[in-house]
Regions:
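Flexible metal-binding regulatory segments at protein termini and peripheral loops
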Residues: 1-121, 147, 222, 239-242, ...
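Conserved ATP-binding TGD loop and adjacent catalytic N/P-domain core of P-type ATPases
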Residues: 7, 24, 412, 504-506, ...
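Conserved cytosolic catalytic loops of P-type ATPases
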Residues: 34-56, 60, 192, 221-316, ...
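Actuator/coupling domain of P-type ATPases
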Residues: 61, 67-78, 82-83, 123-126, ...
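Bilayer-spanning, highly hydrophobic alpha-helical transmembrane segments
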Residues: 100-109, 338-366, 377-386, 391-396, ...
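Membrane-embedded alpha-helical bundles of multi-pass transporters
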Residues: 115-118, 150, 169, 404, ...
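Conserved catalytic phosphorylation-site environment of P-type ATPases
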Residues: 280, 339, 376, 386-463, ...
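P-type ATPase nucleotide-binding
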Residues: 442, 446-575, 587, 599-615
């Protein structure tokens, strides 16, 4: 392959796909182009995700390749959701018009063919009604079948075109030259009603299918609806102008008023407000925004007005990345889908072979009505065979499942993780930021007698303000509102691994651990020692504040445990899942946290590389392991796990590696994600079972296997209705996932 290994991923809409074989054809066509690394078609969503090298091939060239294969790839305005919706709506309305027209004309043909077949000029009247059904309303079947034939392929349209085409041509011959049969003492049968009604019913089935498929993409539409269409921009002269969001550029200053949605990512430059960021963080409490703080597209401004500078626009915003992640996940394939694709690839040729064999067998054993039965049964075989149900079985369930996940703060990157999650029997949780809030807070303070003076609080605050230690910030946050005395601190010195020392006036003060006290010969009395040991036993870190040779205060600092942690762990245990906790903290802290949340298995003082080894060891025991983490130090373990889950407030690296991202700090979402996987996999299995059973039973029935037993032959029109019903039932079953409780 020429050119450098530059990867660009883009999702394009595909028009004209009628079945799973069409999706396979588009995928194969794109995959064969030089410069295309991978193409994944989402038949249920009528889209294709293409990973390609823009230096080797352009979207227009991709479009031409797909067009040559008989389909339409929409490359204009790929990020313009209104344009995509418009095209989809136009295609749906065109299909609706064709369906109504076909039904209106097929109805009189059906009535005449079934009840008034011997009326004068009946055959000619039916011919007059059937021609527009075939040539206009059903034209796409024949055009697409011809396009496939040119490439040596066959699809669902081929089955419809051959079956209705044969029925129509045979009927046309018998209408023009009935004497060919009457001269031999036979009746000249016509099957206009079969041809017309089959096309009408298949169009109706596709209309219902398209309507149902729209419902599977509601999650994407909801996410896209979070972004406003227009925005108020500050011009160079200071005036305001409302402009379309697509015209916003990086560096533009925008105005957001109360109740408005924030259009792009940026930084507040003027004013203040509270913003509802629940769609990004999952937290319901509005976040205060002042100058210098970030704001994100799709979040909702609540009370105040403010101006902000656009930093990320278009496809670069956090919201756009979430939408892209959901789209890519909905287009990804579950492992079972690869088997279904292989079956779909040979399905149509096999069915056409069965139809030919059916025709030959009936011609050999059919007696006086051999040709009539041979024609009807072979047409019925072609009509009843349905690769659509097979093709829709997995992707519709995946689309609905991933969409439902997005609505419940669960972003799933690929179908494989969604399919695998229900098999998880071991979950490894990182402590900091996952089980705990990830932010140390002061939980307890004990001032020794005589040290309660507010001056000492001021000294402690001023010393900790100069420290860069994470625990120092917890002390600053605790005292900054209460202390107003200004203190002059000098000779500040950091004692690595121990704490800090500083002077106020001529007195030296210490803030740190026991080692700092020992080095400076400060003795801890029995009462303070007992208190410190008790706090440490609770998993808290104790900071000692001393001055003048004695301990002035003990400050207990802990990483607060999330309110949801205990309930989530209990729910996972109820599901029979073993829960493990890993932490770099000491064993005392680890045990205290594990006891509080009900975790029986934990490992303390774990290095980042050891987390991945721990996960691997569980896998060697035969467990299917999910790893939940939020930091860069979790990325190796996330990559090693069977299912990797990142907390949405974590690092970008953790979220890049993880296949599932929780855009909330609520750990109860984890058991919900597993429940969603159960629901989705169950729907996939049900869909595949019914799709296979339908074809396994339907095709032999259509071939006439019961004729020798009870004289039953399946009517082609009933076969067409059954075929349409099978596709719609699969989509409807997938939609049930939306309404089930997690």
């Amino acid at each position: 392959m020429s050119g450098k290994e530059i990867h660009t991923k883009a999702t394009f809409q595909v028009l004209g796909m009628s079945c799973a074989v069409c999706a396979l054809n588009v995928e194969t066509t794109l995959g064969a182009q030089e410069g295309v690394y991978e193409a994944k078609v989402n038949f249920a969503g009528s889209t294709v995700l293409v990973d390609y090298n823009p230096q080797v091939i352009t979207p227009v060239e991709l479009q031409k390749a797909v067009e040559a294969a008989g389909y339409e790839l929409v490359v204009e305005n790929t990020e313009d959701t209104d344009h995509a919706d418009h095209l989809q709506r136009e295609e749906f309305l065109a299909l609706k018009r064709k369906t109504i027209g076909a039904i209106v004309l097929a109805l009189p043909v059906f009535v005449i063919g079934m009840f008034f077949m011997h009326m004068p000029y009946g055959n000619w009247i039916m011919l007059a009604f059937t021609i527009p059904v075939m040539a206009f309303f059903g034209r796409d079947f024949f055009v697409h079948a011809y396009m496939q034939l040119k490439h040596g392929r066959a699809n669902m349209d081929t089955l419809v075109a051959v079956s209705t085409g044969v029925a129509f041509l045979f009927s046309l011959f018998n209408t023009i030259w009935p004497e060919y049969w009457t001269s031999r003492g036979l009746e000249a049968h016509v099957y206009y009603e079969a041809a017309a009604v089959i096309i009408a019913l298949i169009l109706l089935g596709r209309l219902l299918e398209a309507k149902a498929k729209f419902s599977t993409s509601t999650a994407i539409k909801k996410l896209m609806g979070l972004q406003p269409k227009t925005v108020t921009k500050i011009l160079a002269d200071g005036s305001e102008e409302e402009v379309p969001i697509r015209e916003v550029e990086v560096g533009d200053v925008l105005v957001v008023k109360p109740g408005e949605k924030i259009p792009v990512d940026g930084e507040v430059t003027e004013g203040s407000s509270f913003v509802d960021e629940s769609m990004i963080t999952g937290e319901s409490i509005p976040v205060e925004k002042v100058k210098g703080q970030p704001v994100y597209a799709g979040t909702i401004n609540e009370k105040g007005s403010f101006r902000f500078r656009a930093d990320k626009v278009g496809g670069e915003t956090v919201l756009a990345n979430i939408i892209r992640m959901v789209q890519e996940a909905q287009g990804s394939k579950a492992p079972v889908q690869k088997l279904v694709d292989r079956i779909a690839g040979i399905f149509v040729p096999v069915v056409m072979g069965i139809a030919v064999i059916t025709f030959i067998v009936w011609m050999l054993i059919g007696g006086d009505l051999a040709f009539t039965h041979a024609l009807l049964t072979s047409i019925t075989v072609l009509v009843i065979a349905c690769p659509c149900a097979l093709g829709l079985a997995t992707p519709t369930a995946i689309m609905v499942g991933i969409g439902k996940g997005a609505e419940h703060n669960i972003l799933i990157k690929d179908a494989e993780s969604l399919e695998l999650m229900y098999r998880v029997n071991a979950i490894v949780l990182d402590k900091t930021g996952t089980i705990t809030e990830g932010k140390p807070v002061v939980t307890d303070i004990h001032w020794t007698p005589g040290a309660e003076d507010e001056r000492y609080q001021s000294i402690l605050l001023e010393i900790e303000r100069r420290s860069e230690h994470p625990l120092a910030d917890a002390v600053v946050q605790k005292f900054k509102e209460k202390v107003v005395n200004e203190i002059l601190v000098s000779d500040f010195e950091n004692q690595t691994g121990k704490g800090v020392t500083a002077k106020v006036g001529d007195k030296v003060y210490l803030v740190g651990n026991r080692a700092l006290l020992e080095v400076n010969h400060v003795v801890l009395d029995d009462d303070n020692e007992k208190l410190a040991v008790r706090w440490e036993g609770d998993g808290k870190t104790v900071v000692f504040f001393a001055g003048g040779g004695r301990v002035l205060a003990l400050v207990a600092i802990a990483d607060k445990i999330k309110e949801s942690s205990r309930q989530a762990v209990a729910t996972l245990h109820e599901k029979g899942i073993d829960v493990y906790m890993l932490t770099g903290d000491n064993a005392l802290t680890a045990r205290a946290v594990a006891d509080q949340v009900g975790i029986r298995h934990f490992k303390a003082e774990v290095m980042p590389g050891e987390k991945a080894n721990f996960v691997e060891a569980l896998q060697h025991e035969g467990k299917v392991v999910a790893m939940v983490g939020d930091g860069i130090n979790d990325s190796q373990a996330l990559a090693q796990a069977d299912v990797s889950i990142a907390m949405g407030k974590g690092s970008d690296i953790a979220m890049d590696v993880a296949k599932v991202t929780l855009i909330t700090s609520d750990l109860n979402v984890i058991p919900r994600a597993i429940a969603l996987s159960h629901q989705t996999v169950r729907a996939i299995r049900q869909n595949l079972f019914w799709a296979f059973i339908y074809n396994i039973i339907g095709i032999p029935l259509a071939a006439g296997v019961l004729y020798g037993i009870n004289g039953f032959l399946l009517n082609p029109m009933i076969a067409a209705a059954a075929m349409a019903f099978s596709s719609v039932s699969v989509v409807t079953n997938s939609l049930r996932i939306k309404w089930k409780k997690l």
